[in-house]
Swiss-Prot record:
Family: Belongs to the avihepadnavirus precore antigen family.
Main localisation: secreted
Residue numbers marked as site, Cleavage: 272-273
UniProt keyword Signal, yes or no: yes
Pfam families: Hepatitis_core
Name recorded for this polypeptide: External core antigen
Summary of the function given for this chain in its UniProt record: May regulate immune response to the intracellular capsid in acting as a T-cell tolerogen, by having an immunoregulatory effect which prevents destruction of infected cells by cytotoxic T-cells.
Length: 305
């Protein structure tokens, strides 16, 4: 992809290299607005917004390598591409797939050119300190067309007669560093969006919350293994698959007046003594007291008389 032939005395080629890098700067630098400001323009749930912000704090080794990440994202997006889906996560993930594929190869080429320039830089040349190189946060505030000018002014302030080949090397290292940091943010956002398509935004939000809790807990107080999104979503999948669907339709509630339940109470008669003679059953209603005989209306003579 990159063919570069430089001789130690090719001053004109070195000057041409600076001019060429100025013209190609707009094509070699990742658009920062795509990786920083885009999520503030989208409407999403407050919990999902916090989880998306927490993605930036996860360890770098948590995310797959760029080649593996792009391949996994394409596999997840392929069904949506076939159906021409316009879902939010599909559109944004597709944008980042294209962005990462294009600028990752470009950034790798910039590193290769910078390494090949080391052979023609005078051995006594001191490298440009990091403080004189434009950082990612500063590049966000500088217009893209003025980025080369600002970097050149810093190199001149470090050493006015800095060698031309060393200047090109410093420019390429600064731009490649900016690209790498922008691509890292794009990589994390791509992981978020295509996993939302695979598992659902709510499940990914829950997973990020549990993972951050596990990472912030001291090692002796937490489990040995980190939580996985498969383990979080498995109970939900089992519960949904185990439900039995009824053939009939469920009657909607609230359309008819509610029937009042009638409570039946059975009142039992007095318990009769075993010593008394059993009387024949009377035609009285069950549970009603037995009528007294006519003799029971007269009082028995008092034993005192």
């Amino acid at each position: 992809m990159w063919n570069l032939r430089i001789t130690p005395l090719s001053f004109g080629a070195a000057c041409q290299g600076i001019f060429t890098s100025t013209l190609l700067l707009s094509a070699l630098t990742v658009p920062l607005v795509c990786t920083i400001v885009y999520d503030s323009c989208l409407y999403m749930d407050i919990n999902a917004s916090r989880a998306l912000a927490n993605v930036y704090d996860l360890p770098d080794d948590f995310f797959p390598k760029i080649d593996d990440l792009v391949r996994d994202a394409k596999d997840a997006l392929e069904p949506y591409w076939k159906s021409d889906s316009i879902k939010k996560h599909v559109l944004i993930a597709t944008h980042f797939v294209d962005l990462i594929e294009d600028f990752w190869q470009t950034t790798q080429g910039m590193h290769e050119i910078a390494e090949s320039l080391r052979a023609v830089i005078p051995p006594t040349t001191a490298p440009v300190p990091t403080g004189y190189l434009i950082q990612h946060e500063e590049a966000e505030e500088i217009p893209l067309g003025d980025l080369f000018k600002h970097q050149e002014e810093r190199i001149v302030s470090f050493q006015p007669d800095y060698p031309i080949t060393a200047r090109i090397h410093a420019h390429l290292k600064a731009y490649a560093k900016i690209n790498e940091e922008s691509l890292d943010r794009a990589r994390r956002l791509l992981w978020w969006h295509y996993n939302c398509l695979l598992w659902g935004e709510a499940n990914v939000t829950n997973y990020i919350s549990r993972l951050r809790t596990w990472l912030s807990t001291p090692e002796k107080y937490r489990g040995r293994d980190a939580p996985t999104i498969e383990a979080i979503t498995r109970p939900i999948q089992v519960a949904q698959g185990g439900r039995k669907t009824s053939s009939g339709t469920r009657k909607p509630r609230g359309l008819e007046p509610r029937r009042r339940k009638v409570k039946t109470t059975v009142v039992y008669g007095r318990r009769r003594s075993k010593s008394r003679d059993r009387r024949a059953p009377s035609p009285q209603r069950a549970g009603s007291p037995l009528p007294r005989s006519s003799s029971s209306h007269h009082r028995s003579p008092s034993p005192r008389k």
